[in-house]
Amino acid sequence: NENCGTRGRRLEEGVALLRQYWEDEHVNFSGQYYQVEEIAMEPKPPQRGAIPIWIGGTKERALKRIARIGDGWMAMTAPGDPPIQEVLPRFKDLLEENGKDPATYPMQMSLSPGAIDKDKRKRFYNDMDLLVARACELRDLGFSDTSIDCVPLFQLGFRSSDALLEQLAKIYEALAPELSD
């Protein structure tokens, strides 16, 4: 049971430790939360210290952290959060403040109808035009990647792996022509 008030600092320290593991032969690290002495990790990643770390969040502290130490942003919104269109300008400013190009910074957001009732959610995941429109909206906002949360699909009746894969294939077939380069 960790204190949620320290999770951001723990994440930052953990990212620093991981990057050191991926780069150095032997790691000595003495942080507030993590300490290691003469630890080695093998094999090293082929990217040599450059495994991209994507971080999620939309609150101000999270956005600052992502812009400072992240390699990609997994955007998300919860009920009561401002729409992503309102968060994006601030995030792009933070990227620039940290010497990162907002036009090329990787950003991902789930293809989701948001917090709406079950009937509208079911329509969303069955209406390929709605899905394509949402994906195009995210692309036009600058998102480089999207994902699909399979939990709502499961909750909407796509219970077997075959049914879920069939629905995901339909979604892919609808999205691919619109979003491929």
For the regions a protein language model found, what residue spans apply to each?
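Active-site-adjacent structural elements that line small-molecule/cofactor binding pockets in enzymes
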Residues: 1-181
